[in-house]
Amino acid sequence: MRRIYLHIASIALCLFTVFSCSVKKNTKLSRSYQAMTTRYNVYFNGIENYKEQLKNMESNYEDNFTRLVHMHPVSAYGNPKETKPNGSFDRTIEKCQKAIKLHSIQKKPKRNQNKMHDPKYREYVKRGEFNPFIHNAWLLMGKAQFYKGDFLAASATFIYITRHFTW
């Protein structure tokens, strides 16, 4: 009988923890939980795909020695006569977008009036993003867009990163 109560209590504790860590709440526990699930679920799959596609792109690209040799295969996107490197970074971009959509915490935390005199705390409260790992997803998305050859989207992503994540 005691084991049954122990199992029920552990399941209830797990459910309570999972449901209390939503992106609509901004507590230390929810930030930690969202950062952990971002890092070890969606971001991990995105970074693994990124590494695989980058290795694919670098190994399959053949230089044309009758023309100017590029330092990196991405440089070939600038010349329409050059062979383009192949690498599908779409899955990486999708994973980053999923991480940002599902795990972004933009709700402001409850203000602690005792800490409002601290300049670091005031800067923290002014942030727009409170998941401590989301900036890595944005950076990976910008790099994937760059290696895909979508330079305008990559530059827009990098500008967004510099505006919102320079703390």
At which residue positions do the language-model features occur?
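Bacterial N-terminal signal peptides that target proteins for export
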Residues: M1-A9
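Hydrophobic alpha-helical targeting segments used for export or membrane insertion
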Residues: A9-T17
